[in-house]
Amino acid sequence: MSQMNALLIILAGAFGMVFFTEMRRRRALRGFWDRACMGIRWRRRFPDSPKTEIREFLSVVVGAFGFRPSRRCCFSPDDKVMDIYRALNPSVGLPDDMELETLAERLEEPYGVDLFKSCREDITLGDLYAQIKKSAG
């Protein structure tokens, strides 16, 4: 086998792996993207919070995960942070874009919340928002 053929096989395998991972990611994220606006759930769970505060928090979340700002309405207070992370990074062992570290940094600076200190496997966006409200109040 020539070096050129070997290189083509390696490139085809790498392309296939990237393509497969991207298809898994899109399928996993579709569960979030196909939802109607979750604003009503946020307002029911946090009736005393102004919409602008909730939107600001969700903007931090979608920014940390690298999603478009318009996607913030797709997330519910019951969504687990790790479910979002795993939907974005479906393949174990591949490098990620450090979304959790970015989220932790963006929550600590303005809100004083240490994500890694308070993080549990099942922590939800609503739990994080409640911590922010508690630290502000």
Annotate the PLM regions:
Residues 2-109, 113-137:
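Phosphopantetheine-dependent thiolation modules in NRPS/PKS and related acyl-activating systems
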